Amino acid sequence: MGGKGADWSRRAILAGLASALAACSPGSLQWGSRSFSLPWGGDNGGGGGLSPIASAPKERFGRGRVNVALLLPLSGNAALSQLGQSLANASKLAIGFIEANPNIGENITISLRDTGDSAAGATSAANAAVVEGVKLILGPLTAEQVTAAGNVARAAGIPLIGFANNGSVAGPGVYVLNVLPETEMKRAVRYLRDQGRRGPAGIFPATPYGEALATAFRQQAIAAGFNPSAVYTFSSISEAQQIIDQAKPLIERGMIDALFIPDRASAATFAGLLAQAGVTNETVQLVGSADWAHDAGLLRNPALAGATFPAVDEAGLNAIRADYAARFGGNPPQMATIAYTATILANVNTLSLATPPYEANLLTNPAGFAGRDGLFRLYADGRSDYALVIKQIGTGGIVTTADGARI
């Protein structure tokens, strides 16, 4: 349950690491240029032999009168179900916080339901939650499952807050609470602008993950007032030298003074080739992604000293770490704070006790909400904004906060 070997990043699970989850143990997973689709749950929602999801909740916790469903994978693929149980634990921790605080009303009861590892399982769990009369659905995890459960919830007029980091599955009434590609790109691009950089460019893998980041980079760079000078894509790392050769003249002319290399698997290669070409961090600011945050090998790479990247403020995770370990054993995964935040959000008086509860205009309050990781907002199109810090890699892999948490 998030213990030894379970170094889960948000993108690792939610971007859908099909090949990695199929072939690796949790301790050996490598993130980076991966697909947004998991191998289980195609168009027909096949579950790879998954048993039908039981109609009864696996568990209930909380003592409030408003029924809220929490849909998570608790069976099926071992890696995914391990994360699902950890997020269920984080939700229980949030309920425990509510119950222990006399200044917070106990408004909700959580009904925990198993989605298994398929779209069909998510549909089944969502249907059972609707029959039970829930007012809000939290989860599921993957993009395919959020889509499946979201279709059920939307038809029933029940809002759903899923945990995928793929904004394409969001829509009116179906929200995604996570760090989306556009969120981290907006944070990083605006930081570059504030630092006086004028020519951002990017190198992205030709994968669904890379394409989503590339699209977000273009959109957010233009929104920040930049005219992106170059956007490169690659299908194989063997193309890296060619890309650097193409970028070098633009760097020399000052047209590129910041370069996004967000893909974990290739970042060190590109940084090394730039160093060999005589490009320093003073000339070109290297920028990574939130996916870099816990890759110790990457952060210790000398070629990346001085690089920056957006990340979730770890203060929130650190604040619940001891309580989680004491109650459940092991360390909470990075995503624990999202399940914790969603549970606290569901209990908010102005949302849960409204008539009717969880109306769209309430959930999309422009002021946003204070979550375990800081400020976040939900928008009418179902997407979200999440407060991020800017981290900078120093000599020897020492990482510091260059700019505090903000949206």
Map each language-model feature to its residues.
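An alpha-beta-alpha
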Residues: 176-233, 329
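Bacterial Sec signal peptide processing site at the extreme N-terminus
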Residues: 20-45
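N-terminal secretory signal peptides
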Residues: 1-23
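Segments of small-molecule ligand-sensing domains
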Residues: 327-402
